[in-house]
């Protein structure tokens, strides 16, 4: 069985989240550039700098700690997670009701979600995860193509 640690119940891949694959390296690069320019020495004289520097350090050193499966990512009230757990479904794409109203709502913001779900069903979860790992290597993040805000019904 596949390691689903980076696969959400709805069918997103955590490695394609900018909070995992984009923000920490960019924060590290900014922190390093500012360090090289001496900001640690003269920045504290600027109001709010210490809070900013601390926040930047946190972003730069952040490790992925989120986990949909453990309820540490996404809204704590996520109806998709709750539904999948109640049905004993590992990923919604394998549910007989896929795509349901909740998934269709989420797909308005994550435009690859439905195609990814169909692909997952066609090739299996293990091969799909490998494809997502390759996708990660390109630098792609879901936010690159998010086209509109989404709302997931609570039902």
PLM region spans:
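Short flanking/linker segments adjacent to small metal-binding domains or redox-active Cys/His motifs
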Residues: 60-72, 129-155
């Amino acid at each position: 069985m596949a390691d689903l640690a980076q696969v959400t119940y709805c069918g997103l891949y955590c490695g394609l989240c900018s909070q995992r694959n984009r923000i920490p390296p960019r924060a590290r690069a900014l922190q390093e550039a500012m360090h090289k320019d001496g900001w640690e020495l003269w920045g504290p004289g600027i109001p709010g700098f210490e809070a900013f520097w601390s926040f930047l350090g946190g972003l730069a050193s952040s490790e992925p700690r989120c986990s949909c499966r453990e309820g540490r990512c996404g809204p704590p009230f996520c109806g998709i997670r709750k539904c999948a757990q109640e049905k004993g479904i590992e990923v919604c794409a394998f549910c007989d009701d896929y795509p349901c109203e909740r998934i269709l709502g989420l797909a308005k913001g994550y435009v690859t979600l439905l195609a990814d779900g169909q692909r997952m069903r066609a090739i299996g979860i293990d091969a799909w995860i490998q494809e997502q790992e390759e996708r990660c290597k390109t630098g792609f993040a879901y936010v690159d193509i998010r086209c509109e805000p989404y709302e997931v019904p609570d039902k």
